[in-house]
């Protein structure tokens, strides 16, 4: 089987983690070996970086610092988890990847896209997903969901204007890469989304 790397993207509260876990269960039932991971995080080093990035007490983190920290966590995850697992024939399911940096730091914060592309290339070694599943949701609804049961983290404290830019960035990237993007309306039911994801991924895996 070819190396299969599947990424879930979307604004906060779009249901990425839920759908990733449902897909993992579906593939496991088909006796397909999988591993689930996330960004930032997925390794001991990455999880420490995640704590720093999401801590609301560090609101002074500069944009460039933020982007480099995300890339550092990504470099560790690719080297320690993603690439070795792919080489073993494991299907890798990842909650966020490179396009999160482009959407949040590029479109959201207005950082130079070419600079972000360079550090992403260095961090990932050019490793790109076979498919990116974008769960598209109006930011108002996403933030309402994500803030429902816990305090907002540093990024969730950003303005709605910021999140609208992030969403627009995702949709623009999806238009540029139609062959590798699956864009779904995240306002659908959990079951409806799961069926569509399984259909697309099942076709990719031949199951």
From Swiss-Prot:
Gene3D superfamilies with a match to the protein in the record: P-loop containing nucleotide triphosphate hydrolases
Pfam families xrefs: Thymidylate_kin
Transmembrane spans: none
Domain of life, per lineage: Bacteria
Stored InterPro entries: P-loop_NTPase (IPR027417), Thymidylate_kin-like_dom (IPR039430), Thymidylate_kin_CS (IPR018095), Thymidylate_kinase (IPR018094)
Catalytic activity reported: dTMP + ATP = dTDP + ADP
GO cellular component terms, A-Z: cytosol
EC number: 2.7.4.9
CDD domains: TMPK
EC class name: transferase
UniProt keyword annotations, A-Z: ATP-binding, Kinase, Nucleotide biosynthesis, Nucleotide-binding, Transferase
Residues bound to ATP: 10-17
Alphabetical GO biological process terms: dTDP biosynthetic process; dTTP biosynthetic process; dUDP biosynthetic process
Family of the protein in this entry: Belongs to the thymidylate kinase family.
HAMAP family: Thymidylate_kinase
Role played: Phosphorylation of dTMP to form dTDP in both de novo and salvage pathways of dTTP synthesis.
Protein name, as recorded: Thymidylate kinase
Organism: Desulforamulus reducens (strain ATCC BAA-1160 / DSM 100696 / MI-1)
Gene expressing this chain: tmk
């Amino acid at each position: 089987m070819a190396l299969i790397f599947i990424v879930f993207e979307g604004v906060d509260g779009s249901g990425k983690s839920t759908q990733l876990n449902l897909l993992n269960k579906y593939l496991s039932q088909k006796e397909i070996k999988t591993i689930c991971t996330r960004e930032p995080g997925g390794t001991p080093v990455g999880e420490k970086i995640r704590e720093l990035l999401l801590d609301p007490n560090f609101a002074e983190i500069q944009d460039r610092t933020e982007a480099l920290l995300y890339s550092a966590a990504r470099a560790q995850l690719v080297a320690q988890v993603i690439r070795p697992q792919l080489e073993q024939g494991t299907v890798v399911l990842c909650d966020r990847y490179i396009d999160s940096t482009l959407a949040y730091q590029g479109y959201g914060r207005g950082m130079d896209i070419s600079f972000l592309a360079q550090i992403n290339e260095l961090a990932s070694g050019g490793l790109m997903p076979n498919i990116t599943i974008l769960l598209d949701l109006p930011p108002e609804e996403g933030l309402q969901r994500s803030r429902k049961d816990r305090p907002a983290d540093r990024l969730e404290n950003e303005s709605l204007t910021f999140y609208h830019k992030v969403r627009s960035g995702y949709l623009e990237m999806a238009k540029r890469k139609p062959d590798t993007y699956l864009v779904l309306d995240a306002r659908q039911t959990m079951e409806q989304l799961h069926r569509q994801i399984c259909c697309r991924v099942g076709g990719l895996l031949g199951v």
